[in-house]
A protein has these predicted regions:
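Histone-fold recognition with a strong bias for associated Lys/Arg-rich disordered tails
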Residues: 1-184
């Protein structure tokens, strides 16, 4: 039996934990579309909750600026190749479990994993700190990478991404400046 993710604003606010209309209203239009895509991906995968791997997968597919944050095109291709294996490989052990770092209360309903909910709030906080009222894809990627217990960080590590180096590059990012690349 597949579980359906909530679609009405009332259900979403009631069931998905700390990510509510306030945070989702503060996403850029592009990031809001990406979140909707991650929600569809979770549903298609038979998952009750959007987790950080769903968010990472959708970010990599849809945001060119996020792809620029990585060392190379082959690194992005390796990541995407790993992420598409979720339903037949590594992700099978995640089915019927909740992504929970232990730092936040576990949410048992449909919607957002506790870690993904925290990451969404952190992405918005990052946008506010840089003076933007809307979080974008790079804000979300930085928040994902900064959460060491996330499934996204596990995927990044398994795909050979140096998570600390990526976080340093993302921490240097400023609106309009793009992501700073390491010197070759």
């Amino acid at each position: 039996m597949q579980h359906r993710l909530p679609h009405s604003p009332h259900q979403q606010a009631a069931e998905r934990g700390p990510v509510g209309p306030d945070v989702e209203a503060r996403l850029s239009a592009e990031l809001a579309a990406m979140v909707a895509s991650a929600r569809r991906r979770a549903l298609r995968d038979g998952d009750r909750q959007i987790d950080t791997a769903h968010l990472l997968h959708t970010l990599l597919e849809s945001d060119p600026e996020v792809r620029e944050a990585f060392e190379s095109g082959p690194q992005v291709a390796r990541l995407l190749g790993y992420l598409v294996q979720r339903s037949i490989g590594y992700g099978l052990r995640w089915q019927s479990s909740v992504e929970d770092s232990g730092a936040v209360p576990t949410v048992t309903g449909d919607g957002w994993s506790p870690v993904a909910a925290g990451v969404m709030a952190a992405a918005y906080g990052r946008a506010v700190r840089r003076g933007d009222p809307f979080a974008d894809g790079v804000d979300l990627l930085a928040a994902l990478v900064a959460e060491p217990e996330s499934r996204a960080v596990e995927v990044l590590g398994r795909a050979g991404v140096d998570v600390r180096e990526l976080l340093v590059r993302l921490d240097g990012w400023r609106s309009g400046a793009g992501v700073s690349k390491p010197e070759a």
